[in-house]
Amino acid sequence: MNIKDRTSEFQQSVLSYKKRNKNFREQQRERLQEKESENFANNTTGNGKSVSEFQKKASGIAHEISSTAQLLSKLAVLAKRKPMFNDNPVEIAELSFLIKRKIYAIEQSLVQLSQLKKTDVNGNTSNQSSKQPSAVQHSKNVVNLLNTQMKNISGSFKDVLEERQRLEMANKDRWQKLTTDTGHAPADDQTQSNHAADLTTYNNSNPFMTSLLDESSEKNNNSSNQGELSFPQNDSQLMLMEEGQLSNNVYLQERNRAVETIESTIQEVGNLFQQLASMVQEQGEVIQRIDANVDDIDLNISGAQRELLKYFDRIKSNRWLAAKVFFIIFVFFVIWVLVN
């Protein structure tokens, strides 16, 4: 009779059984944890509707504040550029309008959030025992933090607009000085020759003036050959000066409009600051009322504790009441013994 050693097979089967049993237990444990989490979520959804709504609204406001801060940083970079060389007034105006709309929308959302917090506090004042003071304090801290961040962003926006206005005014003064200097320049031969040289280089670089230069050169050659006097160069100079003055006037008008837009935006930001200050004042009044209510509750609790201690002392000193209680207990004990 041949005997085979199957110890290794038995050990392998035992290991495989242990692995299967371990995996089965882990699956059961995961299922139980999922059921417990679902039950806990179902139990807490009814109690935490206002809290979840408050948290969702606060997270949305925080996201809007962060996006507004990014736009404000971009606007600050654009506003610090020199308006004469590298300027983009259209993009600056669009960013200013977008930031202004975002600030107004965030202000309205903060008002709604503060109203939601007020309704939550007023709805739970009757059941102070079931109310969690940590949740109320957390909501209060969240509202105060969002108001502070919004105040900082509004202040930064106002500073950026004031810096932009300062640069615009400086550029406007510079252009006015340049135009007055060019208008009252001395008319000597040296300045005329320098201006003619600059005009020649400008005309050579300008493709629209090449035909005019060719015609003027031909007329100059004909007049020099025939001995006649002609001044087409002076006509072209006058035309170029008129074009330069028109372009300067258009540029100054655009700058004036940009300055007016910035001034109106600064005024609107000031109005938003006033609204934010009123909101902060209302929050301060609400906090003071909550503190007063907490003080009243502390006084009531201390008074109730004193009354309970007095009643306990009175019961302890009343021996006749203790004798009555003892006698009643003894009578019930005797009746119970007799009945049994």
Swiss-Prot record:
Keyword check for Protein transport: yes
A GO-annotated cellular component: membrane
Subcellular location: Membrane; Golgi apparatus membrane
Membrane topology: Single-pass type IV membrane protein
Subcellular location, principal: membrane
Cytoplasmic side of membrane: 1-319
DNA damage is among the record's keywords: no
Gene Ontology biological-process annotations: endoplasmic reticulum to Golgi vesicle-mediated transport; intra-Golgi vesicle-mediated transport; intracellular protein transport; regulation of inclusion body assembly; vesicle docking; vesicle fusion; vesicle fusion with Golgi apparatus
SMART domains: t_SNARE (SM00397)
Domain t-SNARE coiled-coil homology: 249-311
Transmembrane segments annotated in the record for this chain: 320-340
Keywords, alphabetical: Coiled coil, Golgi apparatus, Membrane, Protein transport, Transmembrane, Transmembrane helix, Transport
Record annotation: effect of changing N206A: Loss of interaction with SEC23/SEC24 complex
Subunit record text: Interacts with SLY1, STF1, SFB3 and GOS1.
Further comment found in the protein's record: Present with 300 molecules/cell in log phase SD medium.
Family in the record: Belongs to the syntaxin family.
Protein name from the UniProt record: Integral membrane protein SED5
